[in-house]
Amino acid sequence: MSSNNDARKNQPLINDQIRFRTMVVIDDHGNNLGEMNRIDALNLAASKNLDLVVIAKKGNIPVTKILDYGKYKYEQKRRQKESRKNQTIIKVKEIKIKPMIGEHDLKVRAENAKRWLEDKDNVKFVIEARGRMCTKDEFIVQAYEKFIDLIKDYGTVVQANKKVSNYRYETIIEPIKK
C-alpha cells in the first residue's frame, strides 16, 4: 500500500486536486499570467480545454501551468526513457591472487581480465598477502608488474597497487578507449 502512496506523491496536483487559494499561472504558450485565485485559474484552463497542473511548490504560492496533462505525462516518460537509454552501466570484475601465484595461474587470470576489458568492463586486481607474506613487498610488486605487463595492451591503470588494508592491495584497470 505504501508503494501506491509513493506513486501518488510523485504525481503533480491537477485541476480539482489543487487546494491552494492563489497561485502563479503560466499559460499554454509559456507566458506568465501572474497571480490568480484558484477558481479563475481553473476556469481559464477549462475554457482552453486544458488542465491546470502544479509544476512547482515554492513557498506559500505554487506555480501552475495550463497544459494538456496527457501530453505532459507522455513527454516526461519519453525523457526518462531517453535518459535511461543514454546511461552506460560500468561493471567492475574482480581478480584475486596471492603474491606467490604460479606463472600459468597468473596467465589464466590475465586472459579473463583481457576478455572483460574487451567487453568494456573495469577490472579490480586484488593481491592478498596473508601471514608472513605481508612483509615480503618484493613478491607483491613482482606479481603486480607481471600481471600489468600481461594486460597492458587491453587496459590502463587508474589506481595503481593501493594498499587498502594490512594484507590487501588493489589496482583498478579501465579498458582502453578506442
UniProtKB/Swiss-Prot annotation:
Domain of life where this protein originates: Bacteria
Record-level Gene Ontology MF annotations: ribosome binding; translation initiation factor activity
Gene3D superfamilies linked to this entry: Translation initiation factor 3 (IF-3), C-terminal domain, Translation initiation factor 3 (IF-3), N-terminal domain
Keywords, ordered alphabetically: Cytoplasm, Initiation factor, Protein biosynthesis
SUPFAM superfamilies, per the entry: Translation initiation factor IF3, C-terminal domain, Translation initiation factor IF3, N-terminal domain
Xref: InterPro entries: T_IF-3_C_sf, T_IF-3_N_sf, Translation_initiation_fac3_CS, Translation_initiation_fac_3, Translation_initiation_fac_3_C, Translation_initiation_fac_3_N
UniProt cross-references to Pfam families, sorted A to Z: IF3_C (PF00707), IF3_N (PF05198)
Main location: cytoplasm
Signal peptide per UniProt: none
GO biological process per UniProt: ribosome disassembly
Gene Ontology CC: one annotated term: membrane
Cellular compartment(s): Cytoplasm
Coiled-coil annotated residue ranges, if any: none
Subunit details: Monomer.
Function noted in UniProt: IF-3 binds to the 30S ribosomal subunit and shifts the equilibrium between 70S ribosomes and their 50S and 30S subunits in favor of the free subunits, thus enhancing the availability of 30S subunits on which protein synthesis initiation begins.
Membership in a protein family: Belongs to the IF-3 family.
Name of this protein: Translation initiation factor IF-3
Species whose genome carries this gene: Ureaplasma parvum serovar 3 (strain ATCC 700970)
GN (gene name): infC
